[in-house]
Regions:
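Loop-to-helix element that buttresses phosphate recognition and phosphoryl-transfer chemistry
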Residues: 51-102, 183-192
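Short glycine/proline- and acidic residue-enriched helix-loop micro-motifs
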Residues: 148-187
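Alpha-helix capping/helix-boundary segments
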Residues: 100, 218-219
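His/acidic metal-ligating clusters that form di-metal
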Residues: 193, 202-204, 208-217
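Bacterial N-terminal signal peptides that target proteins for export
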Residues: 1-13
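Acidic, low-complexity terminal tails and accessory targeting/binding regions
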Residues: 10-13, 23-41, 127-138, 201-209, ...
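Beta-strand elements within well-structured catalytic alpha/beta cores of enzymes
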Residues: 42-48, 94, 208-215
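Phosphate-coordination/substrate-recognition cap region in phosphate-metabolizing enzymes
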Residues: 28-34, 38, 81-162, 227, ...
Length: 268
């Protein structure tokens, strides 16, 4: 999931000098143009919401929604406490538009002492699972496994070549003709990155830290599109985990992925 670019710089010039006419002329140095920075650096703390009722019941939860469990609320509060302990002072905050995201960002911001409210953006919501929404999670994953040529979901997850993007694209194919919208991994990555780009570009006028609460597969798809190393993300993005993204001069750097240290610090 990484790419390398080979940049070759070559410069060639030919100077013709007429000894009779230009012997007395001196060369004038031309200073290279300095590219002006496009703005101040922005650090986005991209976070998954706390555990929900549908999470606890192992039901499929994309565009469907449910409130946080007691554990989910506690994780959101611990996240905020850990961020506050780290001295992070947020300039702005955003969340997806559903109850679980709003509860998480609100509880975390209360702990941080942020004045104001987060901005809701539907582009940050979870991938849509179409006809599988609200259904049994194991049933959906078994269907995906069979679609990809496996006998059952166990074989799918045990395959070292397992790729989440491929699995999500299979889920979208299984929804064809259902009349319900299901998204591919590329579609969810595109909308999430469009939202993050807009947030970062707006904040880059003065720079600073921004808290963004989204959902697990949306975060995973966005990180994959940014070329992040996801080899250590074995069981998906954890509830309350932070992935730190730095936006500078129109380019992204992924600093951390699936980091639970803030939740852990806030639980002490």
């Amino acid at each position: 999931m990484s790419s390398r670019r080979l940049i070759r710089l070559a410069a060639a010039g030919t100077v013709a000098v007429a000894l009779c006419s230009f012997a007395a002329m001196s060369a004038q140095a031309v200073e290279p143009a300095v590219k002006k920075p496009k703005g101040q650096p922005v650090t986005i703390y991209l976070t998954r919401h706390g555990e929900t009722m549908l999470n606890a019941l192992d039901r499929v939860q994309g565009w469907s929604d449910s409130p946080l469990t007691d554990d989910g609320r506690q994780v959101a509060e611990q996240l905020g406490a850990g961020l506050a302990e780290a001295g992070i002072d947020f300039e702005a905050a955003y969340s997806a538009d559903m109850v679980r995201h709003w509860e998480t960002v609100s509880l975390a911001l209360d702990e941080v002492g942020f004045r104001g409210e987060a901005v809701r953006d539907e582009r940050l919501r979870e991938i849509s699972f179409g006809k599988y929404e609200g259904g049994d999670g194991l049933e959906m994953w078994n269907d995906i496994a069979v679609e990809l040529g496996y006998a059952h979901v166990g074989e799918l997850f045990e395959d070292p070549a397992f790729d989440m993007g491929t699995a999500l694209d299979a889920m979208a194919r299984l929804n064809e003709g259902s009349g319900l919208k299901a998204e591919t991994s590329g579609e969810v990555a595109d909308r999430a990155l469009a939202a993050l780009e807009e947030i970062a570009a707006t904040q880059s006028k003065k720079g600073g830290d921004v808290l963004v609460v989204s959902s697990g597969l949306t975060i995973l798809s966005a990180l994959d599109a940014l070329g992040a190393d996801l080899s250590e993300v074995v069981e998906g993005i954890e509830n309350g985990a932070v992935s730190e993204l730095v936006y500078r001069n129109g380019a992204w750097t992924v600093r951390t992925v699936n980091d639970l240290s803030y939740v852990e610090a806030g639980s002490d």
